[in-house]
């Protein structure tokens, strides 16, 4: 099963945290890397005003696995916590790393704590740009057009600047 992951970081050594997350994801048995996007520096989106001046680094990983979505979610939460993310009552507060599942093949899941595809992915340039780099012709369930087409029509004016192609 092909899974698209969005990785983000906006605390301290952001690139180091993205690299650690990638390494820990790929160290899990049964996970293979199919593609990775460049890393972009991006403006914060949907964060409280006091965090508006803290830019993110964002990227996308495409993995192949037979591991269940629920097990993957547990793995990713463990990795986030291991890298230093702590629960906070403040929504979208700064974090060392955030790992979100954008899509999982053609699956559509809507449960208490899991919605796949991610409901806000097509609205966020910090997800759509790196996803378009690695899967431009992909049509994710719930969308009638490709990722690259969504990018050309995106209304999100936030800044997305290439930081590095290799990481």
Predicted regions and their residues:
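N-terminal beta1-alpha1 ligand-phosphate binding loop
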Residues: 1-31, 36-44
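Flexible, gly/pro- and Lys/Arg-enriched active-site loops
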Residues: 45-56, 67-73, 78-167
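Short basic (Lys/Arg) and small-residue
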Residues: 61
């Amino acid at each position: 099963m092909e899974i698209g992951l969005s990785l983000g970081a906006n605390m301290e050594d952001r690139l180091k945290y993205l690299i650690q997350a990638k390494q820990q994801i790929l160290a899990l048995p049964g996970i293979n890397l199919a593609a990775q996007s460049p890393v972009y520096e991006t403006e914060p989106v949907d964060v409280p005003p006091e965090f508006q001046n803290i830019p993110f680094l964002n990227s996308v990983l495409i993995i192949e696995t037979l591991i269940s979505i629920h097990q993957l979610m547990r793995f990713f939460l463990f990795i986030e916590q291991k890298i230093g993310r702590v629960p906070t009552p403040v929504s979208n507060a700064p974090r060392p790393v955030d790992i979100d599942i954008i899509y999982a093949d053609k699956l559509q899941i809507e449960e208490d704590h899991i919605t796949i595809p991610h409901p806000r992915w097509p609205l966020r340039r910090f997800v759509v740009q790196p996803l378009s780099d690695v899967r431009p012709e992909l049509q994710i369930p719930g969308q009638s057009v490709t990722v690259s087409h969504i990018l050309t029509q995106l209304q999100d004016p936030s800044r997305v600047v290439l930081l590095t192609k290799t990481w």
